Amino acid sequence: MPGRGAVLLAATLAVAGLQAPAAAEGPMAVTRSVLERSNTIVRGSGDRKQKLAALNDLLNGFLDTEALAKLAAGSHLEGRSQAETEEFYRLFHDFFVRTYVQRLLLFDAPDFAYGTETITGDTAKVGTTVITPGDRFAVDYTLRRAGDSWRATDILVEGVSLARNFRAQFDAAVAKDSFQGLLDRLRAKVGAGDGS
């Protein structure tokens, strides 16, 4: 059984390959089409910088990093000023996107299998499997309708929520230092281009 870090890394292609759908497409159709597009980018002839930019655009178009940030922060945003909250959202977005888009290119484009789609009102769950030469990883998306599009509000890798995984890290950072200390760490990582 691979370690959680390896599982999260291997799943990043599925994370990075999503974008805002056309109005007529459901969550599963969107997921399938954009995963294929992400593989095209990774397997394409562009250089690393061009691929990073293209994958970053896909993430910006689909991933609801503010919703992910709220889940990851938990109660730590309570009582914070608007400026602090907005900075946290911005830093989280930049850190999350940079981390997963950069790590994406560590892997050859994998194959995907598609499971079930469940739509309840304005939310949906889409099940997929990331298939690499040596492993298979279940990656389930939680999506929310936003106007005519669908955006991912959480991603579960082998049943582990990425947002809750970040929350555990942030809880530890705040307990050790403070919320301002957490912001300082995020500023440093984003400023240094650190995707680790």
What name fits each language-model region?
Residues 1-9:
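Bacterial N-terminal signal peptides that target proteins for export
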Residues 26-100:
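Early exported N-terminus immediately downstream of N-terminal targeting peptides
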Residues 136-165:
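Short beta-strand edge/turn micro-motifs at domain boundaries
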Residues 154-196:
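Low-complexity, intrinsically disordered terminal/linker segments enriched in charged
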Residues 8-17:
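Bacterial N-terminal signal peptides
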Residues 40, 47-50, 79-83, 109, ...:
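Surface-exposed, polar/charged faces of alpha-helical domains
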